[in-house]
A protein has these predicted regions:
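Short, intrinsically disordered terminal tails adjacent to the first/last structured region
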Residues: 1-24
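Hydrophobic, aromatic-enriched alpha-helical segments typical of multi-pass transmembrane helices
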Residues: 20-237
Length: 238
């Protein structure tokens, strides 16, 4: 009798455990909430960046958002640097968390997992940016550029590469509408990047660059918007 009762009890407990065991691919409620919290970080990251480039020029009387780059806002000796550096670091941390959220949302979509990994890499590399600032234009024109300027350029190129790759893999991860949107985003990034790059020699020579800041901000803006759209799409995914 004891053996019979013991076996029955074991079957009951086993059935109870099976009833609470998540189905393969199913996310626990607590895990789902954590994932959504990480995805919201993507939206917050874009808002932080926009707020930074909107507020920082107020600390620099002669700064022009149309003709000067974002990098100049945290250049060596820039009056806005003390504000921009912590905000940019916050932005990068939020992007890393968003990348983890994208990774956790990938399921069996390998392309989306790659997007998450690229966004994490983008954020990690971005954390180094404020520690390798450029010099102000006047210093560069006087030949006072150093290794930090070179490193800043390398970091920027790596970030752009991660950005383009993330959008490219993202285009393959979701539906047709998001794919077309991602392709349009890449095209805008390429055009904006070329226009910004053409003015780079003039920046170093401290010559007028009347539209350089605008082209760069359009470039940055389309990526920030893409991040928000991706976050919203994943937040609404089952």
């Amino acid at each position: 009798m004891d053996k019979t009762n013991s076996a029955a009890t074991e079957r009951t407990m086993s059935a109870h455990r099976e009833g609470h065991r998540p189905v393969h691919g199913q996310i626990r409620p607590s895990g789902r909430m954590a994932r959504k919290g990480l995805l919201v970080c993507g939206i917050l990251s874009s808002l932080i960046y926009v707020a930074t480039v909107a507020l920082a020029p107020m600390l620099w009387e002669n700064y022009s958002s149309t003709s000067q780059t974002v990098s100049e806002l945290f250049a060596i000796g820039a009056p806005s640097r003390p504000l921009v550096v912590p905000l940019m670091l916050t932005y990068d941390v939020l992007v890393i968390e968003f990348g983890l959220g994208v990774w956790g949302s990938a399921g069996r979509k390998r392309a989306l997992r790659v997007v998450g990994g690229l966004l994490v890499a983008y954020g990690v590399v971005g954390l180094a940016g404020p520690f390798f600032p450029i010099h102000l234009r006047e210093a560069l024109a006087a030949g006072e550029g150093t290794l930090t300027d070179t490193m800043h350029g390398i970091i920027t190129m790596v970030l752009v590469l991660f950005m383009l790759l993330a959008i490219g893999f993202g285009a393959a991860a979701l539906g047709k509408r998001f794919r077309l949107y991602s392709i349009a985003t890449i095209l805008m990034l390429v055009v904006g990047g070329v226009l910004t790059g053409l003015d780079q020699p003039r920046l170093v020579a401290n010559l007028p660059t009347p539209w350089m800041g605008l082209w760069e901000r359009i470039n940055i803006g389309v990526f920030l918007l893409w991040v928000v759209v991706l976050a919203i799409a994943l937040l609404h995914a089952p």
